[in-house]
């Protein structure tokens, strides 16, 4: 009511009275505006950051069935280790369908069942992940360049506080890749950079760049049907979560930063 009275007296008075009222009310509102601005700035700057460094490993096996020239299905099993290769991280079972829309454009749909290890004394958490991959490529000589867009949704089966994290986490991943085919060897070294951004993080945090991944690797054709892939990846991962006080207001933002060095090996077979 006080603000409404100030507004009415300020803009519905006339002449000199209006000027005096405007000056007086401005002096009253300035301290309030300054206090609100200071509080908002302090809230935005209240962020506590922790850092983690880890060496990790991934081992996988992929079985692909060609369905004609343009269609294929793949079953992939992957084991992930963390804490300097000393502890199980996750187990992925992924089923995918790929379709070559054009020689330069490929679309694929994926479902992954993820068994996530939550530490000693706790059961594995099962997660369901669905995503699409849309890949455009350009070839020139022995070089191949590609851009991949990947919208992804991960459903958590364990309880998730919606004020801290989304029960179904949506992200969008962008990957730019360069690959070179070494003539007469079956060897294809590659490098890529991938960015992951959140799409539905809690309002208290806001959407942000969640992960930056860079990778160097090589694919080697053992036979016409089998292949081996070896890679090194560096992940810089960010995880922002609100921490609440006793009054259920955001006390600060906990920001975990992880630097992960990953060695991976995959065997693939096509039939």
For every predicted segment, state its role:
Residues 48-57, 81-90, 120-122, 201-208, ...:
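Solvent-exposed loop/turn segments connecting transmembrane beta-strands
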Residues 87-140:
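Hydrophobic/aromatic-rich structural module bridging two neighboring secondary-structure elements via a short loop
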Residues 131-137, 257-271:
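Outer-membrane beta-barrel "beta-signal"
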Residues 150-249, 270-271:
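Outer-membrane beta-barrel transmembrane domain signature
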Residues 45-49, 71-85, 106-119, 149-155, ...:
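Transmembrane beta-strand segments that form the barrel wall of outer-membrane beta-barrel proteins
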Residues 28-39:
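Bacterial N-terminal signal peptides
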Residues 61, 95, 132-134, 174-176, ...:
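Membrane-embedded beta-strands of outer-membrane beta-barrel proteins
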Residues 69-75, 104-109, 141-145, 184-188, ...:
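Repeated loop/turn-to-beta-strand initiation elements of outer-membrane beta-barrel proteins
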